[in-house]
Each structure stands twice: as C-alpha cells, then as structure tokens.
Amino acid sequence: MLELNDIKKDYVSGSTTVSALKGINLRFRDCEFVSILGQSGCGKTTMLNIIGGLDKYTSGDLKINGVSTKNYKDRDWDFYRNNSIGFVFQSYNLIPHQTVLSNVELALTLSGVSKAERKKRAIEALEKVGLGEQIHKKPNQMSGGQMQRVAIARALVNNPAC
C-alpha cells in the first residue's frame, strides 16, 4: 500500500520557488488500478516521479507498506523500484539497435539476473502483451502501439507487486 501524507514539492530556481504539489493526501490499496487525470502542468508527473522514487518530495511523507520513506537511501529506492513497481513512460525510449527481446531484458540485466532467466522472463512478458512472435524485430520495424506494448512488457518483466 502507498500513502501520500501532505506531500509538497517545490522547485527552486534562483530567487523563484514554484510549488508543484501543495499538500497531496492519497492512499492506494494493494493491487488497485488507478488513473491520474488532470490538466497539463497540474503535477501528475511530479507526483508519479515521487511515488516511483525518481524525485524527492520537499515535505510530507510517502509511506510504502506503512514504512516512511523520509530516511530512504539510494539503495532503498533502488530495491523498491526493482522489486515493487514498473514504469511505462510516455516516451518509451527503446534502444533502436537492439531487438525487442533485448530491450525488455535490459531491466533484468541491470538487476543481475542470469541470461537464461532474463530471456525466459522477457519472452513471458512479451507474450503477455501479445508480442511473443515479434521478439527478434527492432523497434523501427514496429508500430507506435507495438512499441508502447514493448515498454509495458519492460515494466512487467521485473514482476512488480500485483
């Protein structure tokens, strides 16, 4: 479960401070599917970056399974990202000279998973998104929707919670 308690995020540039988040309070239940909607510039991406440990909040507290992240170190965030969540970015950033399979395996390579296990899990993730027959293609041989599904497979390959 994730809890955001009075989360605030300020960006400072010189003498100017911009408040991106102003006291956000949310609670996400385990395995809950959530959509974050809002106008451009309202803080959706900032909030998701904080939840994903890609950005730090200015004040408040983010709790993961009831544990405060106020004192999290980089290694704690790395463990959380590698074992609990999967990211699908708006720009999927696939590596053009690598195959679809290699792109999905990349996250596991960074986590130190064996080659055989990487391949097995990457193929399973690609099959889940309907691309099991496309593993040897390069990103430029796929449609935009297919590339987005590769990015989804890349997010699923680490077996995020739920």
Model regions: which residues?
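ABC family nucleotide-binding domain
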Residues: L2-C162
